[in-house]
A protein has these predicted regions:
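Generic "edge-of-domain/loop-turn" microfeature
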Residues: 26, 76, 228-229, 239
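Short Gly/Pro-enriched loop/turn and capping motifs at secondary-structure junctions
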Residues: 126, 237-239
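RNA-binding accessory domains that recognize and position tRNA/RNA substrates
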Residues: 1-150, 154-155, 169
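Cysteine-nucleophile active-site neighborhood
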Residues: 154, 159, 163-237
Length: 239
């Protein structure tokens, strides 16, 4: 019920194909809101449905794993025909999505005072990420996913950041090759989420699709150095 505003957007558009909610709030209750969720979904032509037992849906996915799904209206199609339509959609395994979400042109996010310079390879980067770097004195040059190692090195960065993003890391052979070339040049590289998996593949590791994706803000992770369990936020379907 917090509504919608342009300041908090992590991207210039909604990327999900559909939205499911049990009980949508009939009111928007936040002083920063400039529109409501329903209005924004309509503006961006995102299919949405309410009145769904999302708890039962969650239990179903918990027991059977992530799966393709469709949202249908009307009675033109039978249940069997709906299933056929859903199965036409591409599975996440083998999906190459970086080209759809990456920036087309490079751009720079400047800090008040520059301590370091980092090149961020945009595999689906969130808007808050370069802003967070800038708040810490890091000048960030965000570049398209298909930027070459030579083009990155020409910017003379102190490090290269591999962003988060959607899709199957096993499809990113060209980006993996770029990262390997940068590693051979001893350029410091770090990544999160999808970018972390790309870095792993560049170092010779394999990735695979999880039957149950890790989603949520309360995922426990054991730090083997300290023996302590940290509560972390996860949102990934591959490991």
């Amino acid at each position: 019920n917090t509504g919608w505003n342009l300041e908090d957007n992590e991207s210039n558009q909604i990327w999900v194909s559909g939205f499911v909610v049990r009980n949508p709030s009939p009111i928007t209750s936040n002083w920063r809101a400039t529109s409501d969720l329903e209005e924004e979904l309509k503006r961006q032509n995102i299919v949405a449905i309410s009145g769904v037992d999302t708890r039962a849906l969650t239990r179903h996915l918990r027991d059977r794993g992530a799966m393709r799904v469709g949202i249908f209206s009307g009675e033109d199609l039978s249940r069997e025909e709906m299933v056929i339509e859903v199965r036409k959609f591409e599975q996440m395994t083998g999906s190459f999505l970086a080209k759809d979400v990456s920036t087309e042109k490079s751009y720079v996010v400047n800090p008040k005072e520059t301590r370091f310079k980092v090149v961020a390879l945009d595999l689906g980067i969130k808007a808050a990420t370069p802003r967070s770097f800038a708040e810490r004195g890091v000048e960030v040059t965000v570049v398209p996913f298909d930027t070459t190692a030579a083009e990155i090195s020409a910017l003379k960065p102190d490090g290269v950041f591999l962003s988060n993003g959607p899709g199957d890391p096993a499809t990113m052979d060209s980006v993996v090759a770029t990262v390997r070339e940068l590693l051979s040049d001893e350029v410091p590289i770090f990544g999160i989420c999808f970018g972390h998996q790309i870095l792993g593949r560049a170092l010779g590791f394999e990735t695979y699709k999880l039957q149950f994706g890790h989603r949520g803000i309360n995922q426990p992770v054991l730090d083997k150095l300290t023996g302590k369990v940290e509560i972390t936020a996860h949102n990934h379907g591959f490991a």
